Design a protein with these regions (language model features):
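Catalytic phosphate/nucleotide-handling subdomain of diverse soluble enzymes
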Residues: 300-320, 326-338
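Conserved catalytic cysteine-centered active-site region
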Residues: 42-46, 50-62, 90-143, 274-302
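Short, well-ordered amphipathic alpha-helical segments that serve as non-catalytic structural scaffolds
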Residues: 39, 60-75, 99, 233-248, ...
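Short acidic capping loops at alpha-helix termini that bridge into adjacent secondary structure
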Residues: 41, 78-84, 111-113, 141-143, ...
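Flexible, glycine-rich active-site loops centered on histidine and acidic residues
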Residues: 136-170
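Acidic, glycine-rich active-site loops and adjacent beta-strand->loop/helix elements
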Residues: 21, 88-93, 119-122, 147-152, ...
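Conserved beta-ketoacyl condensing-enzyme motif
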Residues: 15-17, 57-115, 125, 248-272
Length: 338
C-alpha cells in the first residue's frame, strides 16, 4: 500500500502561520469538587489536569473564527488569499451547513471553499493530512486547518468520568507549499477501527437515534466513555504509531525535537514518550491548563510552543493522536517557521 512518503512530489506542505483562541472562563478542579465526588489531588494524579476553559460567548464557529483571526493578524495574512478551510470538530454549530462555511464568512475569506472533518481527538491530524494533500497536488496555495471543539455542550456535568476531562478551545494553522523538502509535512500514518465505536461516543442526535423527549431524558445527547478501555487503547495506539513513524523514517530519539501528543491524559503522554525513548521534557504538554480540547489540542501546543520561543525552524516533530472511532495516527513534520 502506498503511503504519503512513497510519492514523488515537488512541494511539501509547510506550516507558515499559527493562531489560537481560549475562552476567558476558567474552571479549576475546585469547581468540580462542588458538583461531583472528587478532589483536586485525585484529578491531578489521574489526569494531570488543573484547569480547563468554558466558552460562554458563542459557538464552535465563533471560536474557530477567533483562532483564525489571531493567525491572520499575527502573521499578516490576507484572508481573501485563503483557498480552502478545513475545520476538524465533533461539536459543529449545527449538522449543516458546515462549520467551515460559517468561519469562511466570519473571517472574510470570500474566495475560499471548505468543509468539516469529524475524527474526534484525531481530527486535527486527519485534517492536517488532508490539507497537506491539497497543497502537495499543486492546485492550492493557502489551506487553513482549524481544530475547534466546544465540548461543554456535550458534557454531562454530573458524570465524574467525563466532566473533569474536557475543555473548550480552538487553534489554527496555515499550510502553504514549499520547494524546500527539508521542511514541512513529510509523512503520515493514519488508522481507524469502527469496532471501538461503543467505547467512546455520543449515542443520540444522529440518524440512528434522532432527538426525542425520550433520548433527552435518557441522557443520550452527552458524551459516554468507557475510561479503562479508552486509556488502554490510547496508550497502545499512540505509542505504537509514534514508534512506527520514527522507524519508517529512520529517526532516533535524538532526531526528534518534540513529541506533540493529543492532550487526553498526562499518563498517556508519558507512556508514549517512554515507548519512543524520548525524555518527558521533549513531550509538549498543556493539558494542565486546558484539559482535553479534542481537535484543538495539537495545534494549541504548536502555537504556544512557537510563541514561547521553544519551537525553532528545522525542529523535527512527531504528532500523535488517538480518538473515538477508534481513530489514531501520527504525522512527521519539520518545523518551517523562523
Amino acid at each position: 500500500m502506498a503511503t504519503s512518503k512513497d510519492k514523488i512530489r515537488n512541494y511539501n506542505a509547510n506550516i507558515t502561520a499559527v493562531g489560537m483562541y481560549l475562552p476567558e472562563k476558567v474552571l479549576d478542579n475546585h469547581y468540580f469538587e462542588k458538583i461531583v465526588d472528587t478532589n483536586d489531588e485525585w484529578i491531578v494524579s489521574r489526569t494531570g489536569i488543573r484547569e480547563r476553559r468554558k466558552e460562554e460567548n458563542g459557538a464552535t464557529s465563533d471560536m474557530a473564527a477567533r483562532a483564525a483571526d489571531d493567525l491572520i493578524k499575527n502573521h499578516n495574512i490576507n484572508p481573501e488569499e485563503i483557498d480552502v478551510i478545513i475545520v476538524a470538530t465533533v461539536t459543529p454549530d449545527m449538522f449543516f451547513p458546515a462549520t467551515a462555511c460559517l468561519v469562511q464568512e466570519k473571517i472574510g475569506a470570500k474566495n475560499a471553499w471548505g468543509f468539516d472533518l469529524s475524527a474526534a481527538c484525531s481530527g486535527f491530524l486527519f485534517a492536517l493530512k488532508t490539507g497537506a494533500g491539497l497543497i502537495e497536488g499543486g492546485t492550492y496555495k493557502k489551506v487553513l486547518v482549524i481544530g475547534a471543539d466546544k465540548m461543554s455542550t456535550i458534557i454531562n456535568y454530573k458524570d465524574r468520568n467525563t466532566c473533569l476531562l474536557f475543555g473548550d478551545a480552538a487553534s489554527a494553522v496555515l499550510l502553504e507549499p514549499t520547494e524546500d523538502l527539508n521542511i514541512g509535512v513529510k509523512d503520515s500514518i493514519l488508522h481507524c477501527d469502527g469496532s471501538g465505536k461503543e467505547s467512546l461516543y455520543m449515542k443520540g442526535g444522529g440518524s440512528l437515534n434522532p432527538p426525542t423527549h425520550e433520548t433527552v431524558d435518557q441522557g443520550l445527547h452527552t458524551l459516554y466513555q468507557d475510561g479503562k478501555t479508552v486509556f488502554k487503547e490510547a496508550v497502545k495506539g499512540m505509542a505504537d504509531i509514534s514508534v512506527e513513524i520514527m522507524q519508517k523514517n529512520n529517526l532516533s530519539s535524538d532526531d526528534v525535537a518534540y513529541l506533540v501528543p493529543h492532550q487526553a491524559n498526562l499518563r498517556i503522554i508519558d507512556a508514549t514518550a517512554n515507548r519512543m525513548g524520548i525524555p518527558k521534557e521533549k513531550a509538549m504538554v498543556n493539558i494542565d491548563k486546558y484539559g482535553n480540547t479534542t481537535a484543538a489540542t495539537i495545534p494549541l501546543c504548536l502555537t504556544e510552543y512557537y510563541r514561547d520561543g521553544k519551537l525553532k525552524k528545522g525542529d523535527n516533530l512527531v504528532l500523535a493522536a488517538f480518538g473515538a472511532g477508534f481513530t489514531w495516527g501520527s504525522i512527521y513534520l519539520t518545523w518551517g517557521i523562523d
